[in-house]
């Protein structure tokens, strides 16, 4: 059996560009792509923390070290500059890989879209 699992997440990225007339996609700083284990043309889901919008597109490379998160084409209508988004990708993982210790790559970034930390799990949520 295979399970559809969270593979990669870039948490609380600030949108730096919205390019309505650019070919559709989301340009992501290459440093962030690599840290999250994402590759060019990979399908990504984007969840806008500010307005609740959720949509899918694909990743393209943004200038390395720039902090770029550019929503292009119709995706540019889903956010405003400065909105915080979560960028995620999923993968089909078989039971053997899961039992062997497969983990997602979670990347946490600061206000300038620079990496401030990594994790390989989402902590258990509690009421405290």
UniProtKB/Swiss-Prot annotation:
Major place of residence: cytoplasm
Cofactor note: Binds 1 pyruvoyl group covalently per subunit.
Pathway listed: Cofactor biosynthesis; (R)-pantothenate biosynthesis; beta-alanine from L-aspartate: step 1/1
GO MF annotation, one: aspartate 1-decarboxylase activity
Record-listed E.C. numbers: 4.1.1.11
Binding annotation for substrate: 57, 73-75
Keywords linked to the UniProt accession: Autocatalytic cleavage, Cytoplasm, Decarboxylase, Lyase, Pantothenate biosynthesis, Pyruvate, Schiff base, Zymogen
Cofactor(s) the protein requires to work: pyruvate
Post-translational modification: Is synthesized initially as an inactive proenzyme, which is activated by self-cleavage at a specific serine bond to produce a beta-subunit with a hydroxyl group at its C-terminus and an alpha-subunit with a pyruvoyl group at its N-terminus.
Reactions this protein catalyses: L-aspartate + H(+) = beta-alanine + CO2
Broad class of enzyme this protein falls into: lyase
One Gene Ontology term from the biological process aspect of the record: pantothenate biosynthetic process
Catalytic center residues: 25, 58
This protein's record includes keyword Repeat: no
Residues the record lists as Pyruvic acid (Ser) modifications: 25
Subunit structure: Heterooctamer of four alpha and four beta subunits.
Family to which the UniProt record says this protein belongs: Belongs to the PanD family.
Its job: Catalyzes the pyruvoyl-dependent decarboxylation of aspartate to produce beta-alanine.
Protein name stated in the entry: Aspartate 1-decarboxylase
Protein species of origin: Burkholderia vietnamiensis (strain G4 / LMG 22486)
Phylogenetic classification of the source organism: Bacteria, Pseudomonadati, Pseudomonadota, Betaproteobacteria, Burkholderiales
């Amino acid at each position: 059996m295979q399970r559809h699992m969270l593979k990669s997440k870039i948490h609380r990225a600030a949108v730096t560009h919205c390019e309505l007339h650019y070919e559709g996609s989301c340009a992501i700083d290459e440093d962030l792509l690599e840290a999250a284990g994402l590759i060019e043309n990979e399908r990504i889901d984007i969840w806008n923390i500010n307005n609740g919008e959720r949509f899918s597109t694909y990743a393209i490379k943004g200038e390395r070290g720039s902090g770029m998160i550019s929503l292009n084409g119709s995706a540019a209508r889903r956010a405003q500059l400065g909105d915080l988004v979560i960028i995620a990708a999923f993968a089909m993982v078989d039971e053997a890989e899961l039992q062997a210790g497969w983990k997602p790559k979670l990347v946490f970034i600061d206000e300038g879209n620079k990496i401030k930390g990594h994790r390989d799990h989402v902590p258990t949520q509690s009421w405290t």
